[in-house]
């Protein structure tokens, strides 16, 4: 059987939406090439500027943002977009009122890993433009994740893979590095991805343990207690500091990812951006049979109150996510840790 290419696959979907995905995929292919050539082209290191969140930008952050923005500017169906790198909405100069769709994106997730050559990626989501006929505004983006019509990411690692859902399962396309010239040839390499329901892997930044809520403390301690603890089996812990890399591992072999609420800044409920990080990944998880929550409710039900609204994120294999939700529902059941004291890596919380 001949391989199925992205262009052929998109032909079965609404033409306008397919065209949006086509433009995003082209931008991802350009970013992939730029990332691969970054050490040779002098594109490593800081850009000497800050993004909309006040975070230092890498040179590749700026380049990736330009790649996606240029691609969306050329798409007649996109009214406007929001990028992690900019505080406000960018209205399409040509199609700001007539475009049927809005796009949100993180142009280069995990960019702090660039110089160590760890996998990085681009995350995107497509929303309907509910106020079509008027220029795209911030209010138009205040939609729950359930309204997404497409979401995905590209991961730039040993191979470049575009992971995509248009609401009918999750599919993976690999970029052909031998395609002639500047052509971007994406080939379907995995269709209808399903995340295993159970897992023995979890991913969390353990250095923040002292700030976690008790339900998360309990969950991690039980995992670390291993076979002799209440779970009766051993777990492995992972942490890459790249949301794309963490999610890709979960889609490939299962697992659970936690970036929970913590007490460092009580006025901020989480660390990941809802529109262009949490919601797209939650959409992919649910499309692949997994689950995604804040700990107290489904991520896809949340309506952002700002373009860069941040939330806690727990996603992955359904059994583990549901267990963590149960722990949040009854904090009084988060029992003493003395049972695990000799096995835990963590200092026991004081009463």
Curated annotation (Swiss-Prot):
Pathway: Carbohydrate biosynthesis; Calvin cycle. Mg(2+) 2 binds at residues 106, 109, 277. GO terms for cellular component: cytosol. Its main location: cytoplasm. SUPFAM superfamilies: Carbohydrate phosphatase (SSF56655). InterPro entries: FBPase_C_dom, FBPase_class-1, FBPase_N, FBPtase, Fructose_bisphosphatase_AS. One of its GO terms (biological process) is reductive pentose-phosphate cycle. Keywords: Calvin cycle, Carbohydrate metabolism, Cytoplasm, Hydrolase, Magnesium, Metal-binding. PANTHER family: FRUCTOSE-1,6-BISPHOSPHATASE-RELATED, SEDOHEPTULOSE-1,7-BISPHOSPHATASE, CHLOROPLASTIC. This is Fructose-1,6-bisphosphatase class 1 1.
């Amino acid at each position: 059987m001949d391989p199925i290419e992205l262009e052929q696959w998109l032909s079965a979907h609404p033409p306008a939406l397919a065209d949006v995905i086509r433009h995003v995929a082209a931008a991802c292919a350009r970013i992939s090439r730029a990332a691969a050539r970054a050490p040779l082209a002098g594109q490593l290191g800081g850009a000497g500027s800050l993004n909309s969140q006040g975070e230092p930008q890498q040179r590749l952050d700026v380049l990736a943002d330009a790649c996606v923005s240029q691609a969306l500017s050329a798409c007649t169906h996109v009214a406007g977009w929001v990028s992690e790198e900019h505080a406000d909405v960018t209205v399409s100069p040509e199609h700001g009122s007539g475009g049927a769709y809005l796009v949100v994106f993180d142009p280069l997730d995990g960019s702090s890993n660039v110089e160590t050559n760890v996998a990085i990626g681009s995350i995107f989501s497509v929303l309907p433009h509910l106020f079509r006929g008027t220029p795209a505004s911030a209010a138009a983006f205040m939609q729950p994740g359930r309204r997404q019509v497409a979401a995905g990411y590209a991961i730039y690692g040993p191979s470049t893979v575009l992971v995509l859902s248009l609401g009918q399962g999750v599919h993976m396309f690999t970029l052909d590095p031998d395609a002639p010239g500047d052509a971007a040839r994406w080939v379907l390499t995995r269709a209808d991805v399903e995340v295993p329901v159970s897992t023995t892997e979890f991913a969390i930044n353990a250095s923040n343990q002292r700030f976690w809520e008790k339900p998360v403390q309990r969950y991690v301690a039980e995992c670390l207690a291993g076979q002799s603890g209440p779970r009766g089996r051993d777990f492995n812990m992972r942490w890459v500091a790249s949301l794309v890399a963490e999610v890709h591992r979960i889609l490939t072999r299962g697992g659970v990812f936690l970036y929970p609420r913590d007490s460092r800044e009580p006025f901020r409920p989480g660390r990941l951006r809802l529109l262009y990080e949490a919601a797209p990944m939650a959409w992919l998880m649910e499309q692949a049979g997994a689950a995604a929550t804040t700990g107290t409710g489904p991520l896809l039900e949340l309506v952002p109150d700002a373009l860069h609204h941040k939330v806690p994120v727990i996603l992955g294999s359904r059994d583990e996510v549901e267990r963590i939700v149960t722990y949040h529902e009854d904090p009084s059941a988060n029992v003493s840790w003395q049972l695990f004291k000799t096995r835990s890596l963590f200092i026991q919380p004081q009463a």
